[in-house]
Design a protein with these regions (language model features):
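A short glycine-threonine-serine/GTX helix/turn-capping micro-motif
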Residues: 1-3, 16-21, 59
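Structural signature of PLP-dependent enzymes
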Residues: 12-35, 45-54
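Flexible, glycine/charged-enriched surface loops at secondary-structure junctions
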Residues: 20-26, 42-49, 84, 139-148
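Generic non-transmembrane alpha-helical segments
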Residues: 32-40, 73, 77-79, 129-138
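Anionic-ligand binding region
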Residues: 34-37, 42-73
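Conserved C-terminal alpha-helix-loop-beta "cap" of PLP-dependent enzymes
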Residues: 58-113
Length: 155
């Protein structure tokens, strides 16, 4: 399949030409997203190393939040996300990777995985962060565990 081989070679060359710029943009957007979420959403944890990670991937855990509810409400706002690892997409079980790095089951269950691309814009990140803040606040307002936590910490 000579045409296929030639086409694959050309596609590889094009990808290599754009890889450095694409990676740089994705890292900048990823780091911006991480900073905003950690600064603006209380009781949130970044899962995995802050630097040694894929340039286009973030995974957060939100205490007192059920992952499935989070996904449904974000989906209603037009945000496509996952609650587990890519290996468990479509499953309601928490990510086995998050459990393996020591997250308790209830925190791993409230995880959110977002994937960016070089086509993602800063405005889309801003929209996503605002949506996350709104949804997390709404879900926590319905959580008896969060209510108990707040009461105990006010004393």
């Amino acid at each position: 399949n000579t045409p296929g081989i030639v086409g694959f070679g050309r596609a590889t060359a094009l990808a290599k030409e754009k890889m450095e710029a694409r990676t740089k943009k994705e890292v900048e957007l990823r780091d911006y997203l991480i900073k905003r979420v950690l600064d603006e959403v209380p009781y949130t944890k970044l899962n995995g190393d802050k630097v040694k990670r894929l340039p286009n991937n973030v995974n957060f855990s939100f205490r007192f939040i059920e992952g499935e509810s989070l996904l449904i409400m974000l989906d209603q706002k037009g945000i496509c996300a996952s609650s587990g690892s890519a290996c468990t997409s479509g499953s309601l079980d928490p990510s086995h990777v998050l459990l393996a790095i020591g997250l308790p089951h209830e925190i791993a269950h409230g995880s959110l995985r977002l994937t960016l691309s070089d086509e993602t814009t800063k405005e889309e990140i801003d929209y996503t962060v605002e949506a996350i803040k709104t949804v997390v606040e709404r879900l926590r307002s319905m959580s008896p565990l969060y209510e108990d936590f707040v009461k105990k910490n006010k004393q």
